[in-house]
């Protein structure tokens, strides 16, 4: 394993079968279930940065756990437990590393699409709208401004790219062709329901949920929410008290890092630059504030 138990860049657990190493998570095959470990790696523009962000994996896991509990009346999810003492026996030797940054989950047949929902005009959606008056092929009213709330949330699926590649927006019809019309409609409906419940709650906690992405799959034939949920890695979180239509506010997510990289002149290709200590620490603070605002607790709470 690279790093101490408090700073994890990569995991290596002899005796456990590594199934996949993603941008952030290492996934191990436990037979009829999976072990998902959130490392402290951070990526931007689909490239993994060379230095990690302390506590990031623990923060992401805490936030995902919170949302899975909160949303359990809207959709089933894949979580079995995040209590390492309940994990299969072969995981126990690695308890010190796994504690706080891992989840034991059901195996799912994951759909090959990212389920993106947008409630506000931001990021690539804003750029698309400026050029075409649409977002991912969905026509919107004329005259909208950056960061403006949309008349209603829109569902804009994308492909799931392999590591180092870029996701590509696809139409709902293309998604339906991939997973079936009825299933695609079900996924779209649940995605919107989850967003509406989560965004309403987040607003009460002083956060605007501008957009986010989910993954779904089938567990024993039932639609199931999988992977991370409503984290600063997968979502755009804005502080409500600093929100203004017409400009993109500071946020509790990766946008701070993206903005730094753009200013640095990096060309969004390998090799990425080493992040300065202040950028790492400020990124950590933003992630931690998202956890504290949303859940009411910090890492030790």
Curated annotation (Swiss-Prot):
One Gene Ontology BP term is: 'de novo' IMP biosynthetic process
Xref: Gene3D superfamilies: ATP-grasp fold, B domain (3.30.470.20), Phosphorylase Kinase, domain 1 (3.30.200.20)
Q: Which keywords does this chain's UniProt record carry?
A: ATP-binding, Ligase, Nucleotide-binding, Purine biosynthesis
A GO MF annotation of the entry reads: phosphoribosylaminoimidazolesuccinocarboxamide synthase activity
Q: Which SUPFAM superfamilies is this protein grouped with?
A: SAICAR synthase-like
The catalytic activity of this protein is classed by the Enzyme Commission as 6.3.2.6
Single GO cellular component term: cytoplasm
Task: State the pathway, as annotated in the record.
Answer: Purine metabolism; IMP biosynthesis via de novo pathway; 5-amino-1-(5-phospho-D-ribosyl)imidazole-4-carboxamide from 5-amino-1-(5-phospho-D-ribosyl)imidazole-4-carboxylate: step 1/2
Pfam families, alphabetically? SAICAR_synt
What is this enzyme's class at the first EC digit?
A: ligase
Q: Which family does it belong to?
A: Belongs to the SAICAR synthetase family.
The protein's name in its UniProt record: Phosphoribosylaminoimidazole-succinocarboxamide synthase
Protein's gene? purC
């Amino acid at each position: 394993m690279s790093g101490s138990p408090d700073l994890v860049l990569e995991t290596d657990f002899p005796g456990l079968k590594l199934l996949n190493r993603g941008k952030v998570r290492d996934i191990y095959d436990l037979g009829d279930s999976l072990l998902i470990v959130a490392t402290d790696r951070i990526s931007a523009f689909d490239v993994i940065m060379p230095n990690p962000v302390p506590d990031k994996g623990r923060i992401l896991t805490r936030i995902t756990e919170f949302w899975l509990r909160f949303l359990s009346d809207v959709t089933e999810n894949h979580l079995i437990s995040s209590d390492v003492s309940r994990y299969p026996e072969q995981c126990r030797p690695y308890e010190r590393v796994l504690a706080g940054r891992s989840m034991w989950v059901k195996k799912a047949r994951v759909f090959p699409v990212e389920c993106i929902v947008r409630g506000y005009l931001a990021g690539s959606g804003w750029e698309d709208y400026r050029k075409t008056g649409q977002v991912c092929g969905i026509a919107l009213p004329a005259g909208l401004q950056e960061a403006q709330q949309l008349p209603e949330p829109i569902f804009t699926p994308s492909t799931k790219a392999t590591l180092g590649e870029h996701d590509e927006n696809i139409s709902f019809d293309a998604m339906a062709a991939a997973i079936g019309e009825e299933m695609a409609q079900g996924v779209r409906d649940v995605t919107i329901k989850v967003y509406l419940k989560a965004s309403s709650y987040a607003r009460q906690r002083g956060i605007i949920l501008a957009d986010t992405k989910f993954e779904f799959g089938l567990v024993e034939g039932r639609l199931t929410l999988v992977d991370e949920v409503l984290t600063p890695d997968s979502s755009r979180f804005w502080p409500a008290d600093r929100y203004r239509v017409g400009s993109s506010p500071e946020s509790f997510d990766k946008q701070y890092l993206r903005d730094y990289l753009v200013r640095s002149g990096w060309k969004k290709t390998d090799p990425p630059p080493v992040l300065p200590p202040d950028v790492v620490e400020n990124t950590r603070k933003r992630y931690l504030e998202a956890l504290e605002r949303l859940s009411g607790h910090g890492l030790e709470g």
